[in-house]
Regions:
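Alpha/beta-hydrolase fold active-site loops
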Residues: 1
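Serine-dependent carboxylesterase/thioesterase catalytic core
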Residues: 4-14, 22-137, 144
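Conserved alpha/beta-hydrolase "acid-adjacent" motif
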Residues: 15, 151-156
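Catalytic histidine-centered segment of alpha/beta-hydrolase-like enzymes
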Residues: 43, 172-181
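Catalytic His-Asp charge-relay segment
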Residues: 138-145, 165-167
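Acidic catalytic loop of the alpha/beta-hydrolase fold
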Residues: 147-152, 174-175
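Post-His helix in hydrolase/transferase enzymes
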Residues: 178-191
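Generic C-terminal helix-cap and adjacent flexible tail
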Residues: 192-198
Length: 198
């Protein structure tokens, strides 16, 4: 099953170089880091790019489903693609790192347009995304976050309703989540965790 890494606002695929290398070193063979651009356009258009990357990787590998690891805004974009763009049933697990699932107050501190404005706390976009359940598309969801994340405010916005697990890895900043071995250990646990008995 391919593991696809989706960066956050203003980033690119290089943000995941450390995690991509470490996962490969730990034996995960098919790890792909993707980019979407430009960050200031509508989040729905960015989610379409995420959707297209996943579809392309599934087609090239012949896999039926992918695992997706997302940082920051990559989480809401992936959830949108699962809910609205046809990824439902094609993703096994979604693991988010410091994702503002219900928006962040930081995004309201400056004039913003496009996806940045859509990431404001309790914005119409994030409220619409949560309607009918925050974990769409039949995927298993895990949210990893930190109590000291300086971009995801309040911290509770990183706690995803309906997720299989919400995991606090304390004392890490927003970008430090990408480079922490403690986070990497949790990501791997989520990737390996057996499906819960019904």
């Amino acid at each position: 099953t391919p593991v696809i890494l989706v960066h956050g606002y203003g980033g690119n695929s290089a943000n995941f170089l450390f995690m991509q290398w470490r996962l490969k070193w730990r034996g995960w063979g098919n790890v792909y880091s993707v980019s979407y651009t430009p960050p200031h356009i509508n989040a729905r258009k960015l989610a379409q790019q995420v959707n297209d990357h996943v579809e392309r990787i599934l087609a090239s590998t012949g896999a039926q489903k992918a695992h997706i690891v997302c940082h920051s805004m990559g989480g809401p974009l992936t959830r949108y693609a699962l809910k609205n763009l046809g990824l439902a049933g094609k993703v096994d697990r979604v693991i988010t790192l410091g994702s503002p699932h219900y928006g962040s107050r930081i995004a309201g501190l400056f004039p913003a347009q496009g996806s940045a404005a859509q990431m404001r706390y309790q914005s119409p976009f994030v409220q619409e995304l949560a309607e009918g359940g925050s974990c769409p598309g039949g995927a298993r969801f895990f949210s990893i976050y930190s109590n000291l994340d300086n971009f995801v405010l309040p911290v509770s916005t990183a706690v995803l309703d309906g997720a299989e697990a919400n995991i606090n890895v304390p004392y890490l900043g927003h970008c430090a989540l990408l480079y922490s071995n403690r986070v990497l250990d949790q990501v791997e646990r989520c990737l390996l965790s057996p499906k819960p008995e019904v």
